Amino acid sequence: MNRKYKSLWPVIMFVVLSGLQLIGLPAFAQGPGPGQRIPLPPIPIKGDTTHTLSKHFTPASAATKTPDAKGFIQRWLVLEPVKKEIDRNNIFTDNYLRTTFSNDNFSGDYTTVPKNGETVKVGNQELKWYALDSKAFNFNLYHFTYALNKPKYGILVWLVTVINCPEEIQNVRIAAGCNSGSMWWLNGQEALLLSGDRDMIADNGTSARLTLKKGKNIIRGAVINGPGMANFCVRFLDEKGTPVKNLSISYE
Protein backbone atom coordinates (compact mmCIF):
# COMPACT_ATOMS: atom_id res chain seq x y z
CA MET A 1 0.00 0.00 0.00
CA ASN A 2 2.75 2.43 0.84
CA ARG A 3 4.35 1.81 -2.51
CA LYS A 4 1.04 2.51 -4.25
CA TYR A 5 0.56 5.82 -2.45
CA LYS A 6 4.12 6.84 -3.20
CA SER A 7 3.55 6.28 -6.91
CA LEU A 8 0.39 8.42 -6.83
CA TRP A 9 1.95 11.28 -4.89
CA PRO A 10 3.31 13.23 -7.92
CA VAL A 11 -0.10 13.02 -9.59
CA ILE A 12 -1.86 14.33 -6.47
CA MET A 13 0.57 17.26 -6.18
CA PHE A 14 0.07 18.18 -9.85
CA VAL A 15 -3.74 18.25 -9.43
CA VAL A 16 -3.51 20.38 -6.25
CA LEU A 17 -1.12 22.93 -7.80
CA SER A 18 -3.21 23.18 -10.95
CA GLY A 19 -6.29 23.89 -8.86
CA LEU A 20 -4.52 26.63 -6.92
CA GLN A 21 -3.45 28.31 -10.16
CA LEU A 22 -7.00 28.26 -11.53
CA ILE A 23 -8.32 29.77 -8.31
CA GLY A 24 -5.77 32.55 -8.48
CA LEU A 25 -6.43 33.55 -12.10
CA PRO A 26 -9.54 35.68 -11.41
CA ALA A 27 -7.60 37.67 -8.84
CA PHE A 28 -4.88 38.43 -11.33
CA ALA A 29 -7.45 39.34 -13.98
CA GLN A 30 -9.17 41.91 -11.77
CA GLY A 31 -8.57 45.63 -12.31
CA PRO A 32 -6.75 47.87 -9.86
CA GLY A 33 -8.14 48.11 -6.38
CA PRO A 34 -9.55 51.20 -4.67
CA GLY A 35 -7.27 54.23 -4.95
CA GLN A 36 -5.15 52.69 -7.69
CA ARG A 37 -4.83 54.49 -11.05
CA ILE A 38 -5.60 52.60 -14.25
CA PRO A 39 -2.41 52.54 -16.36
CA LEU A 40 -2.74 54.59 -19.54
CA PRO A 41 -1.32 53.58 -22.91
CA PRO A 42 1.89 55.40 -23.90
CA ILE A 43 1.39 58.70 -25.70
CA PRO A 44 2.93 58.53 -29.19
CA ILE A 45 5.55 61.15 -30.04
CA LYS A 46 4.03 63.80 -32.23
CA GLY A 47 5.60 63.77 -35.68
CA ASP A 48 6.33 66.65 -38.02
CA THR A 49 3.03 67.55 -39.66
CA THR A 50 4.03 70.94 -41.05
CA HIS A 51 5.00 69.83 -44.58
CA THR A 52 7.24 72.87 -45.09
CA LEU A 53 10.51 73.05 -47.01
CA SER A 54 11.94 75.62 -44.58
CA LYS A 55 12.55 72.98 -41.90
CA HIS A 56 15.47 71.44 -43.80
CA PHE A 57 16.06 73.73 -46.79
CA THR A 58 16.28 77.38 -47.81
CA PRO A 59 15.44 78.76 -51.26
CA ALA A 60 18.61 79.15 -53.32
CA SER A 61 19.49 82.76 -54.09
CA ALA A 62 21.76 84.62 -56.50
CA ALA A 63 24.30 85.09 -53.70
CA THR A 64 27.57 83.20 -54.06
CA LYS A 65 27.42 79.75 -52.50
CA THR A 66 30.54 77.76 -51.67
CA PRO A 67 30.85 74.17 -50.45
CA ASP A 68 30.55 73.61 -46.72
CA ALA A 69 33.58 73.19 -44.45
CA LYS A 70 34.07 69.61 -45.65
CA GLY A 71 33.51 70.37 -49.31
CA PHE A 72 29.94 69.07 -49.66
CA ILE A 73 27.69 70.62 -52.30
CA GLN A 74 24.47 71.83 -50.70
CA ARG A 75 22.83 73.81 -53.54
CA TRP A 76 20.78 71.80 -56.00
CA LEU A 77 18.01 72.06 -58.54
CA VAL A 78 15.72 69.20 -57.52
CA LEU A 79 12.85 67.82 -59.56
CA GLU A 80 9.71 66.54 -57.88
CA PRO A 81 9.86 62.74 -57.64
CA VAL A 82 9.04 60.49 -60.56
CA LYS A 83 6.77 57.85 -59.04
CA LYS A 84 8.00 54.29 -59.59
CA GLU A 85 6.62 50.89 -58.58
CA ILE A 86 9.60 49.53 -56.62
CA ASP A 87 9.05 46.92 -53.91
CA ARG A 88 12.70 46.24 -53.05
CA ASN A 89 16.06 47.90 -53.52
CA ASN A 90 18.19 44.90 -54.46
CA ILE A 91 16.98 45.16 -58.08
CA PHE A 92 19.24 48.18 -58.71
CA THR A 93 21.81 46.54 -60.97
CA ASP A 94 23.98 48.56 -63.34
CA ASN A 95 21.75 47.59 -66.26
CA TYR A 96 18.53 48.39 -64.38
CA LEU A 97 19.77 51.86 -63.41
CA ARG A 98 21.03 52.77 -66.88
CA THR A 99 17.80 51.59 -68.52
CA THR A 100 15.54 53.34 -66.01
CA PHE A 101 17.46 56.62 -66.06
CA SER A 102 17.41 56.60 -69.86
CA ASN A 103 13.67 55.90 -70.10
CA ASP A 104 12.46 58.17 -67.28
CA ASN A 105 14.52 61.21 -68.24
CA PHE A 106 13.43 64.84 -68.41
CA SER A 107 16.02 65.62 -71.13
CA GLY A 108 18.53 63.72 -73.24
CA ASP A 109 20.84 66.74 -73.11
CA TYR A 110 22.93 66.12 -70.01
CA THR A 111 24.31 69.65 -70.02
CA THR A 112 20.94 71.38 -69.85
CA VAL A 113 20.21 73.46 -66.75
CA PRO A 114 16.49 73.71 -65.89
CA LYS A 115 15.01 76.92 -64.54
CA ASN A 116 13.82 77.23 -60.96
CA GLY A 117 10.04 76.78 -60.92
CA GLU A 118 9.94 75.28 -64.41
CA THR A 119 7.69 72.28 -65.01
CA VAL A 120 8.66 69.35 -67.21
CA LYS A 121 7.02 66.10 -68.19
CA VAL A 122 8.48 62.68 -67.45
CA GLY A 123 6.22 60.06 -68.99
CA ASN A 124 2.71 61.14 -68.02
CA GLN A 125 3.86 62.95 -64.85
CA GLU A 126 4.18 66.74 -64.82
CA LEU A 127 6.86 67.75 -62.33
CA LYS A 128 8.32 71.00 -60.98
CA TRP A 129 11.92 72.09 -60.36
CA TYR A 130 13.02 73.62 -57.04
CA ALA A 131 16.31 75.45 -56.41
CA LEU A 132 17.21 74.75 -52.79
CA ASP A 133 20.10 74.90 -50.33
CA SER A 134 20.22 72.03 -47.86
CA LYS A 135 20.82 73.02 -44.24
CA ALA A 136 22.81 69.81 -43.75
CA PHE A 137 25.85 68.49 -45.63
CA ASN A 138 23.59 65.95 -47.34
CA PHE A 139 20.38 66.49 -49.27
CA ASN A 140 17.62 64.42 -47.69
CA LEU A 141 15.12 63.61 -50.43
CA TYR A 142 12.71 62.06 -47.91
CA HIS A 143 12.42 65.47 -46.23
CA PHE A 144 12.05 67.13 -49.64
CA THR A 145 9.23 64.86 -50.82
CA TYR A 146 7.53 64.94 -47.41
CA ALA A 147 7.53 68.75 -47.40
CA LEU A 148 5.86 68.79 -50.83
CA ASN A 149 3.39 66.06 -49.81
CA LYS A 150 4.67 63.92 -52.68
CA PRO A 151 5.45 60.18 -52.77
CA LYS A 152 8.31 59.36 -50.39
CA TYR A 153 8.97 55.76 -51.41
CA GLY A 154 9.34 54.17 -54.83
CA ILE A 155 10.77 57.31 -56.42
CA LEU A 156 13.32 58.59 -58.93
CA VAL A 157 14.61 62.13 -58.36
CA TRP A 158 16.61 64.18 -60.88
CA LEU A 159 19.20 66.72 -59.73
CA VAL A 160 21.27 69.45 -61.39
CA THR A 161 23.81 71.93 -60.08
CA VAL A 162 26.37 74.28 -61.61
CA ILE A 163 29.98 74.33 -60.37
CA ASN A 164 31.93 77.50 -61.15
CA CYS A 165 35.73 77.22 -61.09
CA PRO A 166 38.10 80.22 -61.21
CA GLU A 167 40.66 77.99 -62.95
CA GLU A 168 40.97 74.50 -64.35
CA ILE A 169 41.30 71.80 -61.68
CA GLN A 170 42.71 68.48 -62.85
CA ASN A 171 42.69 65.01 -61.32
CA VAL A 172 39.65 65.47 -59.09
CA ARG A 173 37.10 62.79 -58.29
CA ILE A 174 33.37 62.99 -57.65
CA ALA A 175 32.72 61.33 -54.29
CA ALA A 176 29.09 60.48 -53.58
CA GLY A 177 26.89 58.59 -51.17
CA CYS A 178 23.23 57.73 -51.68
CA ASN A 179 20.26 55.72 -50.58
CA SER A 180 19.72 53.58 -52.51
CA GLY A 181 21.11 53.79 -56.09
CA SER A 182 22.32 56.72 -58.18
CA MET A 183 24.17 57.90 -61.26
CA TRP A 184 26.21 61.08 -61.79
CA TRP A 185 27.30 62.96 -64.90
CA LEU A 186 29.83 65.78 -65.30
CA ASN A 187 29.53 68.06 -68.32
CA GLY A 188 27.40 65.53 -70.17
CA GLN A 189 29.60 62.49 -69.51
CA GLU A 190 28.88 59.62 -67.14
CA ALA A 191 31.18 59.94 -64.12
CA LEU A 192 29.90 57.59 -61.42
CA LEU A 193 27.35 54.80 -61.02
CA LEU A 194 26.31 53.58 -57.56
CA SER A 195 24.26 50.42 -57.95
CA GLY A 196 22.80 48.03 -55.39
CA ASP A 197 20.95 48.60 -52.13
CA ARG A 198 23.11 51.22 -50.42
CA ASP A 199 22.90 53.29 -47.28
CA MET A 200 23.80 56.97 -47.48
CA ILE A 201 27.48 56.98 -46.50
CA ALA A 202 29.72 59.89 -47.46
CA ASP A 203 32.22 59.05 -50.22
CA ASN A 204 30.66 55.60 -50.65
CA GLY A 205 31.78 55.69 -54.27
CA THR A 206 34.33 57.75 -56.18
CA SER A 207 34.76 58.38 -59.88
CA ALA A 208 37.84 58.05 -62.03
CA ARG A 209 40.04 61.16 -62.27
CA LEU A 210 38.20 64.09 -63.85
CA THR A 211 38.94 67.66 -64.86
CA LEU A 212 36.86 70.62 -63.72
CA LYS A 213 37.22 73.19 -66.46
CA LYS A 214 37.57 76.90 -65.85
CA GLY A 215 34.12 78.47 -65.70
CA LYS A 216 30.87 76.47 -65.58
CA ASN A 217 30.66 72.74 -65.00
CA ILE A 218 27.31 70.94 -64.98
CA ILE A 219 26.62 68.09 -62.59
CA ARG A 220 23.54 66.00 -63.19
CA GLY A 221 22.42 63.30 -60.80
CA ALA A 222 19.65 60.73 -60.52
CA VAL A 223 18.77 59.05 -57.23
CA ILE A 224 16.37 56.12 -57.06
CA ASN A 225 14.89 54.35 -54.04
CA GLY A 226 12.14 51.90 -53.19
CA PRO A 227 11.40 51.32 -49.49
CA GLY A 228 13.31 53.54 -47.07
CA MET A 229 14.65 57.07 -46.95
CA ALA A 230 16.06 58.53 -50.19
CA ASN A 231 19.13 60.65 -49.53
CA PHE A 232 22.45 61.71 -51.09
CA CYS A 233 25.64 63.73 -50.64
CA VAL A 234 28.29 64.84 -53.16
CA ARG A 235 31.68 66.54 -53.08
CA PHE A 236 34.92 66.66 -55.07
CA LEU A 237 38.20 65.24 -53.75
CA ASP A 238 41.68 66.06 -55.04
CA GLU A 239 44.55 63.61 -55.64
CA LYS A 240 45.35 63.53 -51.92
CA GLY A 241 41.74 62.88 -50.92
CA THR A 242 41.32 66.45 -49.68
CA PRO A 243 37.94 68.13 -50.31
CA VAL A 244 37.99 70.64 -53.17
CA LYS A 245 36.58 73.94 -51.91
CA ASN A 246 37.95 76.62 -54.25
CA LEU A 247 34.77 76.71 -56.31
CA SER A 248 31.29 78.22 -56.14
CA ILE A 249 27.87 76.70 -56.71
CA SER A 250 24.84 78.13 -58.52
CA TYR A 251 21.61 76.89 -60.05
CA GLU A 252 21.82 78.76 -63.37
Q: For each predicted feature, which ranges?
A:
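Bacterial N-terminal signal peptides
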Residues: 10-24
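Signal peptide processing junction and immediate N-terminal pro/mature segment
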Residues: 23-31
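Accessory carbohydrate-binding/adhesion or oligomerization-edge regions at the termini
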Residues: 30-139, 222-252
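Beta-strand-rich ligand-recognition modules
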Residues: 186-234
